Amino acid sequence: MAKKLYIKTHGCQMNEYDSSRMADVLRESHGLELTSDPEQAEVLLLNTCSVREKAQEKVFSQLGRWRQLKQSRPELVIGVGGCVASQEGETIRVRAPYVDLVFGPQTIHRLPAMLTQAKASSQPVVDLSFPEIEKFDKLPEPRAEGPTAFVSVMEGCSKYCSFCVVPYTRGEEISRPFDDVIAEIVGLAEQGVREITLLGQNVNAYRGSIGEGDTADLALLIHYVASIEGIERIRFTTSHPVEFSDSLIQAFAEVPALVSHLHLPVQSGSDRMLSLMKRGHTVLEYKAKLRKLRQVRPDISISSDFIVGLPGETEADFQATLALVDEVGFDHSFSFIYSPRPGTPAASLPDCTPIALKKERLAILQGRLRALEIAISRGMVDTVQQVLVERPSKKDPTMLAGRTANNRVVNFSASQDMVGQFVNIRITEALPNSLRGIVLDAKRRCA
C-alpha cells in the first residue's frame, strides 16, 4: 500500500499551486500519495499564508490539532511551509516544538532531502533560503488533476506596498523563463487540461527570458499559450494596476481564449489612501485602464480587493471607496479590515480609528459589493453560458459543476462523462454563491 501525504493549504491560488508541486515532488521521491484524511498520513504539511493576522493564527490552531496525532504516532512528520514559515522561521518551533520541517515558498523542491534528513536524524530541519528560480528547475513534471490547472509564471513582488508582507516572505519579482512556462503548459494540455490560470503575486510584471537578452511580457505569453493545442481558456491573477499595460489590454481584444474576467485589486477609492499605501497610481489612472479595457471587452467582469481601516482613513476616504465601487460596478470582490503585518511601513503608522468603526465600514462595503454581485448573478438568469465542466458539485455529488467565463460556479445535472467538456448551459436560478442551469448541448469534446 502506498504511503500517504496530507497537505492543508491556507491562502491564495499561488499556495494551491505550491501545494500541488509539493505533492508532485514527494510522490516522485518518496512514493507518497495524497490523502484527504490526516490520520492516514505519515507526513502532514501545512502550507501557510501571512497576509492577514487571522490567517497566521489559523496556522497555530491547526498545529495544535495535529499535536495530538504526533503524540500518538511519534514517527509522524509535520512540516510547515509557505509565507508564515518564511516570516516566523524558528519561532514556529518555539510555539510548536513538535514540528519537524520548516521551509519557505522558494524551497519546496528541497522537500525530499529535508524529509529524508528529518527521518534519519530525528532532528528538525529548517530551510528558509531564497534560491530564486532554482525551485522551478528542480520540480518534476506536474500531474493534472482535472481539466483546469494553475501554472506559476513568476514569484515575489517588488512593489512594496506599505501594508503588504509579500515582498518580505516571497522575495523580489522573479520570472520563469518563457520556454519553461510553455513546456509546462504543453505537458498539462497533453494530460487533458483545457483551462490554464497563469499565476504570480504581480503576474502582469512577468518578464520571461526568451534568449539573447530578450524578454516576453505577459501579453506575449498569453498569445503563445492560446496557440497550444487543447488550451481553450486562459485566466491570470493577481494583477497590479501599475503594470496593467496597453499590450495586455490589446490581448483581450485579440485572444478569444482569454476570459472576460479580470481581478484587479485597487484597495481604496481615495487617492490619499492610495498614496499612504504606496500603490503607485491614482483612482483616475485605475479607472482609465478599466475604460480602455471595456472598449475592447464590453462584457468583462471586474473584481477587486479592498482594505478598510488603514491608519489615517477618514470618513471621506471611505466614502470615496464606496463611490468607486458604485461607479465601476465590481463583481465578486474581497474586502478586509487592515491587519498590521510586522516589518511593513504601515505597521508603524499611528492608528486612532476605533475597531468598531472599522467593522461598521467593512460591513457597509461588503453589503455594497454583495448587492452588485447578486445583481450580476440575477442578470445572468435566462442567458446561455459556456461552461467548462470541472468536477462533481461540492454540495451535491449527483450534479456536476463548472465555471462560466466570468468566473461564476454553475451546478447542473448531467452525466459524469461530461467532465472535461465545454457545454452550453441555460442559467435557471441565481443562488447566494452559485448559479444553477440546464445543459443545452456539448460544444466540443475534450480529449
Curated annotation (Swiss-Prot):
Domain TRAM: 378-441
Secretion signal, residue range per the UniProt entry: none
Described purpose of this protein according to its UniProt entry: Catalyzes the methylthiolation of N6-(dimethylallyl)adenosine (i(6)A), leading to the formation of 2-methylthio-N6-(dimethylallyl)adenosine (ms(2)i(6)A) at position 37 in tRNAs that read codons beginning with uridine.
NCBIfam families per the UniProt record, alphabetical: miaB-methiolase, MiaB/RimO family radical SAM methylthiotransferase
Originating gene: miaB
Subcellular location: Cytoplasm
Keyword Iron-sulfur in record: yes
Protein family per UniProt: Belongs to the methylthiotransferase family. MiaB subfamily.
Single GO MF descriptor: metal ion binding
Protein name: tRNA-2-methylthio-N(6)-dimethylallyladenosine synthase
